[in-house]
């Protein structure tokens, strides 16, 4: 999905 | 983490360190847009505030700290230590044309209307256009030093590899983040013209210069 998740990308 | 993502991060790191070393070794920041570097420092600061709220991994934390530290060091070198060599007369892009629209867009189009999420979104939008002052400077002076070209190439490759990472993640994890993908596409497209010049000129041993 396109929802807010913990941001693991930089 | 897939290979595209990892190589993308390495390419980003390479670009940042290449620029730092170029300025440090030559004791000069001629040809470098201080405005783009300030924008990148703003991008990292706005995006990595989650260092204080969210622990993801040692890799994630280290990379974020290194990106921020290098970015602020670069800004300091340009505006303080080697200020005399800074080419301000050619660095005339109006950054408010980038900051204001991306800030408004971040308020309007985001995943969640919270301060951290809006700042993250702002950083994604701003990053996609933050290189414009630098590209504008290259087009204005009509040339770029070879090492500056390598820097721009590595920086462009980073977001391009992230695009492949997102295709991979969508395919294998069903994960996608539309805000990052669209902004990443815009960012990559902005580099396309430069990629062409880099491959046709710089890789053949010529200095990057634009036709008058």
Curated annotation (Swiss-Prot), chain B:
Residues recorded with modification Phosphoserine: 209
Outcome following mutation: residue 209 to A: Inhibits coatomer/ARF-GAP recruitment, receptor redistribution, and intracellular retention of KDEL ligands
Impact upon substituting residue 47 to K: Loss of recycling together with cargo proteins containing the sequence motif K-D-E-L from the Golgi to the endoplasmic reticulum
Any one GO BP annotation for this protein: protein transport
Segments on the Lumenal face: 1-4, 53-58, 111-116, 169-178
PTM per Swiss-Prot/TrEMBL: Phosphorylation by PKA at Ser-209 is required for endoplasmic reticulum retention function.
Protein topology in the membrane: Multi-pass membrane protein
Cytoplasmic side: 25-32, 80-92, 136-149, 200-212
First-listed, main subcellular location of the protein, grouped into a coarse class: Golgi
Region (Important for recycling of cargo proteins with the sequence motif K-D-E-L from the Golgi to the endoplasmic reticulum): 204-207
Pfam families given in the database record: ER_lumen_recept (PF00810)
Annotated TM spans: 5-24, 33-52, 59-79, 93-110, 117-135, 150-168, 179-199
Ranges where the record places region Interaction with the K-D-E-L motif on target proteins: 47-48, 159-169
Lineage top rank: taxon: Eukaryota
A GO term from the CC aspect: endoplasmic reticulum
KW Glycosyltransferase (keyword) present: no
Residues annotated as site: Interaction with the K-D-E-L motif on target proteins: 5, 117
Keyword terms, alphabetized: Cytoplasmic vesicle, Endoplasmic reticulum, ER-Golgi transport, Golgi apparatus, Membrane, Phosphoprotein, Protein transport, Receptor, Transmembrane, Transmembrane helix, Transport
Gene Ontology molecular function terms on file: ER retention sequence binding; KDEL sequence binding
Site entry: Important for recycling of cargo proteins with the sequence motif K-D-E-L from the Golgi to the endoplasmic reticulum: 193
Keyword RNA-binding assigned: no
Quaternary structure and partners: Upon ligand binding the receptor oligomerizes and interacts with components of the transport machinery such as ARFGAP1 and ARF1.
UniProt function note: Receptor for the C-terminal sequence motif K-D-E-L that is present on endoplasmic reticulum resident proteins and that mediates their recycling from the Golgi back to the endoplasmic reticulum.
PANTHER family hit by this protein: ER LUMEN PROTEIN RETAINING RECEPTOR
UniProt family annotation: Belongs to the ERD2 family.
Protein name as it appears in the record: ER lumen protein-retaining receptor 1
Organism, as annotated: Homo sapiens
């Amino acid at each position: 999905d396109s929802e807010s998740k913990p941001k693991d990308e930089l | 983490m897939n290979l595209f993502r990892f190589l993308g991060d390495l390419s980003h790191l390479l670009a940042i360190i290449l620029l730092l070393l170029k300025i440090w070794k030559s004791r000069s920041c001629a040809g470098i847009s201080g405005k783009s570097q300030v924008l990148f420092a703003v991008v990292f600061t706005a995006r990595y505030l989650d260092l204080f709220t969210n622990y993801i991994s040692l890799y994630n934390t280290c990379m974020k700290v290194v990106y921020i530290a290098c970015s602020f060091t670069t800004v300091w070198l340009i505006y303080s230590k080697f200020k005399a060599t800074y080419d301000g007369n050619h660095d005339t892009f109006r950054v408010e044309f980038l900051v204001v629209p991306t800030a408004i867009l971040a308020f309007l189009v985001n995943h969640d209307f919270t301060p951290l999420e809006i700042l993250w979104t702002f950083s994604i939008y701003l990053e996609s256009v933050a290189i414009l002052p630098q590209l504008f400077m290259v087009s204005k002076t009509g040339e770029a030093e070879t090492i500056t070209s390598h820097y721009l190439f590595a920086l462009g490759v980073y977001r391009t590899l992230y695009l492949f990472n997102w295709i991979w993640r969508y395919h294998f994890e069903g994960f996608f983040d539309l805000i990052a993908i669209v902004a990443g596409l815009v960012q990559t497209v902005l580099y396309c013209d430069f990629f062409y010049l880099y491959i046709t000129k710089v890789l053949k041993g010529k200095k990057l210069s634009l036709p008058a």
